[in-house]
Regions:
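NAD(P)H-binding glycine-rich loop region in Rossmannoid oxidoreductase-like domains
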Residues: 34-92, 96
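Conserved Rossmann-fold NAD(P)-dependent oxidoreductase catalytic core, especially the SDR/UDP-sugar
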Residues: 87-138, 142, 150
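SDR active-site strand-loop-helix element
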Residues: 6, 30, 71, 100-105
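Conserved dinucleotide-binding and phosphotransfer motif residues
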Residues: 23, 43, 145
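N-terminal Rossmann NAD(P)H-binding glycine-rich loop of SDR-like oxidoreductase domains
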Residues: 3-25
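Short glycine-/acidic-enriched loop or helix-start segments at secondary-structure transitions
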Residues: 15-16, 39, 79-81, 110-114
């Protein structure tokens, strides 16, 4: 498969790229810096220069790949807005049967203490990630457009 990754130079992204390459996939990763370029190239991936706000770059990469794994974690209000714009763009440009992996985290379930929580649990995100629930719903809505979504 041809797979495009955002956040590929990060902690999780590096492991994901390494595993994808080990399994024989072509991988391209969005990068913002020379250091990130060196990191993803060192893993055998193609560097695609841009940021979460570079929707034209992300759109082209989405069209050129079979799957997109969105690992870039928003860290500011501007990043959160860019993440929402990326999801909106995906609804308009992702080819039929495109695979879109949108990563999340346990904090969308809130602080449950020692309780066991699974994916059927209601979302009660902590303030830091309160925006995530709406974004996850937006990602899941891509299924209606023929995109295969994993959150």
């Amino acid at each position: 498969m041809r797979i495009f990754v955002t956040g590929g130079s990060g902690y999780i992204g590096r492991s994901v790229i390494a595993e994808l390459k080990r399994r024989g996939h072509h991988v391209a990763a969005l990068v913002r810096s020379d250091a990130a370029t060196a990191t993803v190239r060192g893993l055998g991936a193609v560097a695609v220069h841009g940021s979460l706000t570079s929707l034209d770059v992300i759109e082209l990469a989405t069209r050129e790949h079979d799957a997109t794994i969105h690992l870039a974690g928003p860290k500011s209000p501007d990043d959160i807005a860019a993440d929402a714009a990326l999801l909106k763009m995906m609804a308009n440009v992702a080819p039929d049967d495109h695979v879109f992996v949108y990563t999340s985290g346990a904090w969308v379930y809130g602080d449950r203490g020692d309780a066991v929580v699974d994916e059927a649990a209601p979302l009660k995100p902590i303030a830091l990630v309160a925006w995530r629930a709406a974004h996850e719903e937006q990602a899941l809505a891509l299924e209606a457009k023929g995109v295969r979504v994993v959150v």
